[in-house]
Every structure is written in C-alpha cells, then in structure tokens.
Curated annotation (Swiss-Prot):
The lineage of its organism: Bacteria, Bacillati, Bacillota, Clostridia, Thermoanaerobacterales. It is found in: Cell membrane. This is ATP synthase subunit beta. SMART domains: AAA. GO terms for molecular function: ATP binding; ATP hydrolysis activity; proton-transporting ATP synthase activity, rotational mechanism. It holds the Pfam family ATP-synt_ab. Belongs to the ATPase alpha/beta chains family. Keywords: ATP synthesis, ATP-binding, Cell membrane, CF(1), Hydrogen ion transport, Ion transport, Membrane, Nucleotide-binding, Translocase, Transport. InterPro entries: AAA+_ATPase, ATP-synt_VA_C, ATP_synth_F1_bsu, ATPase_a/bsu_AS, ATPase_alpha/beta_chains, ATPase_F1/V1/A1_a/bsu_N, ATPase_F1/V1/A1_a/bsu_N_sf, ATPase_F1/V1/A1_a/bsu_nucl-bd.
Amino acid sequence: MKKGYITQVIGPVVDIRFEGDLPPINNAIKIPMGDRELVVEVAQHIGDNTVRCVAMASTDGLRRGMECIDTGGPIMVPVGKGVLGRMFNVLGQPIDELGEVKDVKYMPIHKKPPSFEEQNPATEILETGIKVIDLLTPYPKGGKIGLFGGAGVGKTVLIMELIRNVAIEHGGYSIFAGVGERSREGNELWLEMHEAGVIDKTAFVFGQMNEPPGARMRVGLAGLTIAEYFRDEEHQDVLLFIDNIFRFVQAGSEVSALLGRMPSAVGYQPTLATEMGALQERITSTKKGSITSVQAIYVPADDLTDPAPATTFAHLDATTVLSRSIAEMGIYPAVDPLDSTSRILEPHIVGEEHYYVARKVQEILQRYKELQDIIAILGMEELTEEDRLIVYRARKIQRFLSQPFFVAEAFTGTPGKYVPLKETIRGFKKIVEGEMDDIPEPAFYMVGTIDEVYEKAEKMK
C-alpha cells in the first residue's frame, strides 16, 4: 500500500503527494478521518510527485499533512444477485439501512468497452407492451434509448412502467442509476417498486443533487458496472435506466473547471465527447447478453443543439420525445408520434407489415396536423370527403395511442394493460384500412387491444 499526505485542498479537489511511485489515473485513494473514510479518485498527475484528486464525498474536516492510502485500483462496487432489491451510493455502500450486502463480488467501475469481435449489433425488438413505443419507436434489444421531455410530462412514470413490464413480462433485471437526481424522486421510485412487487428484480445506485460533482460524475459508471456483470457473467438481458444523462455532463463540467481545464463551447468541458463516449461505448450488446439503456435527457432551454444533448444524440438508437401538448389533451403516455424515431423501424428488421402500418399511421397524423389550421378557421365542413375521413381516423389513432399503465392504476382507477406487438399492429392496421370507421371516437381512449374497443363500443350503444 502506497502512502502519501495531503498538500492542498480546494473544495472537492485534493492534492496528495507520494514519495516514489505515483498511483495511476482513476485509482481510488482512501483518507481515514476518524469515524469515516473519504474516498478520492486520481484525476491528474501535476508533477513534483503530486496527484490531483476529486472527492466522492464532502471534504469537510480535511487538513494538510493527513495520511492517504492508495487502494491500488479503481473504485470497486458490489455486483451479483446480492445487489438486487438494494440501494447504493457511488462507492457501492448500501444506503437503504438494510444492513450488509451478502452474496456479492466486487468489480472496478472503470474498464474497457467490449471489443468489436465481442459486440453483437442490436437488430431485435424489445417488446415493451406499450403500443405507441412498440409501433412507432421500437426499442432495439441492447440498444440505447433517449427519453426527451420537460417537467411533468411523464418521464418517470414511463420509466417505472418499463421497469415493471420488463421485470414481469420478460423476467429481466433492471438497474436504476440516479445521476444528480432529486432525492425525493429516488425515494418515490423506491416505494413504487416495492408496491409493484418488482423490487427484487431491481438494483438502485444514487448520486443525488446535493452530492459533490465527483460522485455525480461516477454514479453512472457504478450502475453500468452492475449491469455489465449481469450481461457478461449471468448472460442476462438487462435494462439500465439513467436519470439524468444531462446531470452527468454537468458534473463533468464542474470537475473540469475545478481541475483548471480551459472550457470549450458554451462553457462545457473540453473532454465532453470523450467522457460521454467512455460511458456510452460500454452500454452495448455482446454475444453473451445485452444491456438496453433508457436515458432520460434534460434539454437546457429546449435547445437540442446544446452540446450536452447534441453529444448524446450521436450515441442513441431510438429517441422517444414526450410532448406537453399531447399531455394537455389527456393522452398518456404523452409520446409525440411524429417527433420520435427509431433506427430499427426498417422493413428488413421489423417486417413489411409493421413498417407499412407504422408509416401509414404517421402519414395520417402528419396530414391531420397540416389540416388543423383549416379546421380552426373554416371548420370541418370545408374539408373534402377524403380529408374528413383522414381527420376522423387520425383522432381515433391519437386516442388509441393512449394506454392505461400498471404503475398509474392507483391514480387512474383503470387496470393497466400490456399489449403484445402483434396485437398493436393488428389494431392500428384495422384503423388505417378503414375497418373501424363506424366506431365512435371515445371507444378508442385508454384501452389495450382493438378487441377492447369493440367491447367498449358495445357498452356505449
């Protein structure tokens, strides 16, 4: 064990001098502080036998000359079946007051991404049971999905429904990394997962808003390491939820400024693309298993060209855009069917029928959007017979894209629905081909499959 001593402390940044060999970049160094132990991570070698480190917790109480011990490797987090149903901080210490973690191994949070030979391109759909997603923005198994949305449009509810559906319908594991999250939201999610009965299929890692930037910057990697173990050693298909990827970038920007690096565009860190790549390149499918990641992305001032969301875009396979105008209509999940995209919505991947139905749905909705100005000024009577039909079908499609969620049962009083992909395609095909033209609009709202529309229409007679 190499030992050194503190030479200077500037906020969350600590300089430590070692005689002889210096610990390499990314090594964890422990600083004993009486009843607790502070962990710092080596960020730079600044010459004169000194390393500059970033703290993972508050540096209150540190002083010059204190002894520091190099652990000889990066931060290690617990992995394995023992982490399921538990909640950890960035250092892998349990924060749920349920005692010690049992039945786990420890792995470093820094490692190389899988090589090209090991990778397996994502060309298979992960069925979510959510109609609008499966039809228009199919999620690739082992792909990366971005969830763009403002406050209060339902990002968290959508994430919770996805965790529930994957756990119950697919029997898969989910890892949730709260990066710069509100502690309240983390607590709500924890309680929701208990109520939904899927807590034993889920592991949580949190680095909340109130923690130093070092912790917020590394918590995503800690969650990813747990997911990688399930993929590589247990050969599982895992879901990794990161909320919020923007806070990861923000923490990196704070650390960069503290380390004295010159800022680049819009004041972000010059290493923005490298840091994002180091995280994103490890989230991938291999021949052993897959990691499918759903990442909530906050868009500063609704500007998608801001360096943070713009850098994230380059890595994504599918984008789900949540829209306030759709939420205002009472249609949940409030996914924008025209703004959301998916790389795998191609006929050779999803099949001709799925592709045809999805494009037809978008075509009808796009035409309806164009006609809305005319309707607002002149009314429906001025439209041609053909356009009127498109409007009626579009309104039915809009309502049929809504769906009752399991995790929202307590609020809506409507039991949740899981809709298989085949049923989703069959339902929308009937609408676009005119088979449902004589069924009233309200019958399409908040139902699961198309058969339920018939049942609802019967009751309305």
